[in-house]
């Protein structure tokens, strides 16, 4: 199921763009992803109410993730590589939902309390 979603030429090409730049700075892919979410995405982590839910399989992994959250923005060449990689793979990137998503409730009411 996941092989069909992610094992695509564009995905591997994107990784070949990202990995050398990440390695040049001594970063891990996980650290790069977390720091991008905190500092370079549209999320408002520091001055807003957005958050990131992480899953871990060990205490060591939790410590590493929390440490990475506290680090600053990524070097510009890493951000540039991520942007370039996204341009390569976005046309074939899978949708988050594997099946069609149908809400069984009024989403506007749930999100905004029915205000106009």
Kindly give the residue locations of the regions a language model identified.
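Polar/charged alpha-helical tracts
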Residues: 24, 76-80, 109-110
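Intrinsic disorder/low-complexity segments
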Residues: 38, 89, 93, 107-109
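Glycine-rich, positively charged active-site loop/lid region within alpha/beta enzyme cores that binds
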Residues: 1-21, 47, 95-116
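Conserved short secondary-structure transition element at the edge of the structured enzyme core
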Residues: 4-71
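Extended hydrophobic/aromatic segments used for targeting, binding, or gating
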Residues: 59-62, 66-98
